[in-house]
Amino acid sequence: MDVHIIVKLKSSFEAWHQLFLNDSDRRSQICDESRTLVGKANEKTAIVTVFGVNMEAMGAMMADPEFQKMTENYVEEHIPYSLTPLIPPS
C-alpha cells in the first residue's frame, strides 16, 4: 500500500527533516525507502509519501514507545492517508 502522511510539526522543518533523514534504516524495514518522498509544505507542516508499505509493521513502529519518544519534541501529529493510483481513462 502507498501512504501519504501530513506531519504537523512542533519543531522547525529543518530540525524534523534531519531526524527524518537519520531514521531511514527503520523506515526501510516497513516500506520501499528508495521511493520515499518528503517535502516542506509550510513552516509547521511536512509531507511524506511512502510506497510499498507493510501497514502492520508501520502501525507497530508508530506505536513503539521508542519511536514516540524520538518524535515527541518534533511532531505534534501524523495524519496518514492511503493512496490508490488512478487508472487513466480509456
Language-model region placement:
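Short, well-ordered beta-strand segments in beta-rich or mixed alpha/beta enzyme
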Residues: 2-9, 38-64
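Short, surface-exposed ligand-recognition loops at beta-strand->loop->(often short) alpha-helix junctions
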Residues: 8-19
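An amphipathic, aromatic/His-enriched active-site/gating alpha helix that lines ligand/cofactor pockets
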Residues: 21-36, 51-84
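Short, low-order "capping/linker" segments at domain edges
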Residues: 85-90
